[in-house]
Amino acid sequence: MIDFFLKSEYLPAGDQPKAIKEIENSILLGNKYQTLKGVTGSGKTFTIANIIKNLNRPALVVSHNKTLAAQLYREFKDFFPNNAVEYFVSYYDYYQPESYVPSKDLFIEKEATINSEIEIKRIRTVTSLAKRRDVIVVATVSSIYALGSPDFFKKSAREFFVGQRISIKEISDIFVELYYERTLINLERDKFSIKGDIIEIWPSSEHGEFAYRICLDFDEIVKIYRISSFSKKNLGATNSFTLFAKSYFVIPYQNVLEAIPKISYDLDLQCQYFKDNGKLVEAERLKQRVEYDLEMLRETGFCSGIENYSKYLSGSTMGRPYCLFDFFPKDYLLFVDESHVTLPQFRGMYNGDYSRKLNLVNFGFRLPAALENRPLKYDEFDALINQVVFVSATPGFEENEKSSVTVDQIIRPTGLVDPEIITRHSDGQMEDLYIEIQKRVALKERVLITTLTKKMSEDLTEYLVTLGVKAKYLHSELDTLERVEVISLLRKSEIDVIVGINLLREGLDIPEVSLVAILDADKVGFLRSATSLIQTIGRAARNSNGLVIMYYDKISVAMREAIEETNRRRQIQIDYNKKNNITPKTIVKKIQNILEKELNNKNKNISYDFEKMVSGEKLSKKKLIDKLKFELEEAVNDERFEDAIVLRDKIKELGSKISVARNK
């Protein structure tokens, strides 16, 4: 078994060693629930990484949105370069579920656009879990949605090895059985090609852009090579490789044959129910739709909306659908990041899905079995937990109630303390805010301002700009790349102020920010709850000059709770620093990322490569652009938007050079 190897320049510091030890001890004692209550910037991810390494168990880390999941994915990839770190989130770019609106007698067909790159990462996730134990999966709420049988997926594995007696046709039939398609032109992802006694396949389940080339002689495999998927360059020989299905919805044809009479039986029962209750239209509608699906299943083994028959096809006898949790070994560890938000999100998934599908069943569009293609109920999710660590700066009632151990992680390795909080009456707040901004600008520091509405953020930004402040607003109407560009401008000091609404959602941990101003801090609501206020205060906790100003009309209960908790933590941190002679230092975070440096280095050689390509000494430049476009798509799907911006600009630059050359 491969052990987890943690790569880091640093050792645990501050409260991290204590937190690691106490949580590990609790897990080793067999406790199911434990909580890591860590302040912003205390290195909770590094603590989790150390726990995974020390306990040496597979781990699932769940977050409440794709952006934060992507950040965690990148961090764990850096921490564990020699282990399988995977990413499992929704693969839909656009999704309109099948639904029926009785008041309008309107049936809406399912429409979806699947993101192929995220789908690849999902396949890699289940493949890694089927092959090895040293796996860390970072996921979202997608982890509780229905998947195929893990047993069927594992049994789909086929090994190919040098010396194996097998024909080209037999290999081809196996590939087709595993849902791979043959291509007669260029080799593409999840397809295979045959040329004489050579068969090549590019499985997306493999990490890295490479394919396999199998060479046969008289129905015997004599050589297996790994080759570059783009250039076909030989990357070296291998004695064997294992191929899994390209889908985690593996359905043996025998299961399809066995399911058909069960579906027919339930169809007769439901049609009779409708007729007995005078619903003749519903009975006829259901009969037509299901009989058409049955005919497709008999002829092809597939039908549109086959997921609605998963109860019959999956072989599950558990009374619930399979999901990602079922692909993990029994001793896995679960980490719920930002649990105060993630747990309520998981709790709410089932009800919304159920109410939509119930209409489809009641009006004869689907059999009752369609209700079983669903996300898990919360108690089912809880039952699948082996041992869990809830991770949050502000744990909710459930975490506090269930946990055998709650460990505070208050001391930051950097020595930084929670920001000072000042409360000021809202009278004259605009003038006061402008003065505070000017103070920060003079120190070359940045400012975040949080409002309650989009209109307020836009109006305040416009007002500040008229006063000569370099400011931009940030809210959901900006697309993802635009939001990243605004954050990048702030870090580069091209603007000094960002005005936003829910700055927590943006994941704004920017060390240059020394002032967070909270307008209408006393208003009642989610964005001004004690939990949200504490989280917002944390945005100023990465700078040694951190300050938070709350503007109010009347100090609220939530304000008082947030201030008291922050001051409690702040005093503990100050006392620790005095005792250990620590001087807090602002976190230094490089603005230029690693990929941007790599691309700059690549760019130095682009003109050189270009000249050689023009003279016929290199491959076509189109392939280079295709490669960069592929990297761009991966960057966007991984939520590495700063990288995506850099790649986009390089592609544009390279493309313009090509057009100039063609016009010469």
UniProtKB/Swiss-Prot annotation:
Subcellular location: Cytoplasm
UVR domain residues: 622-657
Motif (Beta-hairpin): 91-114
One Gene Ontology term, aspect cellular component: cytoplasm
Pfam families: Helicase_C, ResIII, UVR, UvrB, UvrB_inter
Binding-site residues for ATP, renumbered to this chain: G38, V39, T40, G41, S42, G43, K44, T45
Keyword Glycosyltransferase: no
Annotated Helicase C-terminal domain residues: 429-595
Keywords in alphabetical order: ATP-binding, Cytoplasm, DNA damage, DNA excision, DNA repair, Excision nuclease, Helicase, Hydrolase, Nucleotide-binding, SOS response
Helicase ATP-binding domain mapped to chain residues: 25-170
Comment text on domains: The beta-hairpin motif is involved in DNA binding.
PANTHER family assigned to the protein according to its UniProt record, in alphabetical order: UVRABC SYSTEM PROTEIN B (PTHR24029:SF0)
Family: Belongs to the UvrB family.
Assembly and interaction partners: Forms a heterotetramer with UvrA during the search for lesions. Interacts with UvrC in an incision complex.
Name of this protein: UvrABC system protein B
Lineage, highest ranks first: Bacteria, Pseudomonadati, Spirochaetota, Spirochaetia, Spirochaetales
Gene name per UniProt: uvrB
